[in-house]
């Protein structure tokens, strides 16, 4: 049976440099994390700020702290009814697939608000 691993959301530790963030997560005893760059890394205001150099520095910081990045979190709204808005949000997610690969993240996550419920006609 696989080992049970407990992780934490990175942004629950505040906004920091990658080194500071992963050191804090590791010291708190967590083996893995969900990383949402726009919520957890200083200086990242949009996904355009996540450069290949930043992704590599993030991976190195996580490795040094003994923390794996289980989820590359992209907090975008994928349930917009307006197709142009939805496409813009999907583009943000797609831009992060190469980053997830660098981070060795097992999956990518997002968050959908109750806006999705308005699309269901009961």
Tell where the protein language model's regions lie, with residue ranges.
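N-terminal pre-domain/capping segments
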Residues: 1-107
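Mobile beta-alpha loop/short-helix "lid" or hinge segments that flank ligand
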Residues: 103-117
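Conserved small/polar residues in nucleotide/adenosyl-binding loops
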Residues: 120-122
